[in-house]
C-alpha cells in the first residue's frame, strides 16, 4: 500500500496499526476487481497513472472490507488461512480496516485534481454507503431469521457487490470522455458474482474460501 504518512504519525507507528491489513494482503485473492477496472478501460481510456491510483483504492477498500466481513460472519478461515482477528484481535482488526477506508479517501484527495475533487468525494461516499446498505441488510436477514423476497435479495446483492464496481467505474469516468451510463452492466456483474459466491459458499466443503 501507499507508504506516505502524515507529519504527525510516523511510518513505524502506522505499520503497527495496519498489521491485520498487511496480513490479509499477503495472501492475495484473484484481484477480480482490478481486472474488471482494467477491462472497463477498453472503453474509458484513462491514463495509466490514474488507472493505477483507482485500482489501488479499490483493492485497498476490498481487502479492508474482508477484515470486517470475517468478524461479522464469525469466520475462522480466509483464503485457507486463519482470519486476521483470530491473530490480532477484534478491536485492532476493526481499527485497521476503518483506518484503511480513510487512507483510501485521503489518497483520492491527494491524487485527484482539485477541480474534480467534490465529485470524486461524492462518488466515494455514495458508493460506500451502498456497499454498507447491502451488507447491513444481509446481516439483518441472517440474524433475524428473515427470508428476503427475490427482489429484496437482488437489491441487496447489487448494493453489496456493485458498490465497489460502481466506485471504480465512476471514478474512472471523471477522467474519461466516455460518459455512457454503465449502471445496468455494473449491476449485472455484481449480481452474477455475488450469487456465484453465495452458491459456492453453500456447496463448498470450505465455506470460508474467498473466490474473488
Question: Locations of the language-model features?
Answer:
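N-terminal amphipathic/basic leader segments beginning at the initiator methionine
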Residues: 1-8
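Mg2+-dependent prenyl diphosphate-binding active-site environment of isoprenoid biosynthetic enzymes
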Residues: 11-212
Amino acid at each position: 500500500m501507499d507508504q506516505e504518512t502524515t507529519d504527525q504519525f510516523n511510518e513505524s507507528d502506522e505499520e503497527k496499526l495496519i498489521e491485520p491489513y498487511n496480513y490479509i494482503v499477503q495472501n492475495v485473492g484473484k484481484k477480480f476487481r482490478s481486472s474488471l477496472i482494467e477491462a472497463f478501460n477498453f472503453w474509458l481510456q484513462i491514463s495509466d497513472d490514474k488507472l493505477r491510483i483507482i485500482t489501488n483504492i479499490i483493492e485497498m477498500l476490498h481487502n479492508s472490507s474482508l477484515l470486517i466481513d470475517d468478524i461479522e460472519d464469525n469466520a475462522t478461515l480466509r483464503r485457507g488461512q486463519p482470519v486476521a482477528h483470530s491473530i490480532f484481535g477484534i478491536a485492532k482488526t476493526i481499527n485497521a480496516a476503518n483506518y484503511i477506508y480513510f487512507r483510501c479517501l485521503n489518497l483520492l484527495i491527494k491524487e485527484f485534481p482539485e477541480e474534480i475533487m467534490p465529485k470524486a468525494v461524492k462518488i466515494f461516499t455514495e458508493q460506500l454507503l451502498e456497499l454498507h446498505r447491502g451488507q447491513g441488510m444481509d446481516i439483518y436477514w441472517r440474524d433475524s431469521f428473515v427470508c428476503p423476497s427475490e427482489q429484496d435479495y437482488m437489491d441487496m446483492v447489487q448494493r453489496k457487490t456493485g458498490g465497489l464496481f460502481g466506485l471504480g467505474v465512476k471514478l474512472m469516468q471523471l477522467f474519461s470522455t466516455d460518459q455512457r451510463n454503465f449502471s445496468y452492466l455494473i449491476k449485472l456483474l455484481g449480481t452474477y458474482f455475488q450469487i456465484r459466491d453465495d452458491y459456492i459458499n453453500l456447496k463448498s466443503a470450505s465455506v470460508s474460501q474467498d473466490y474473488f
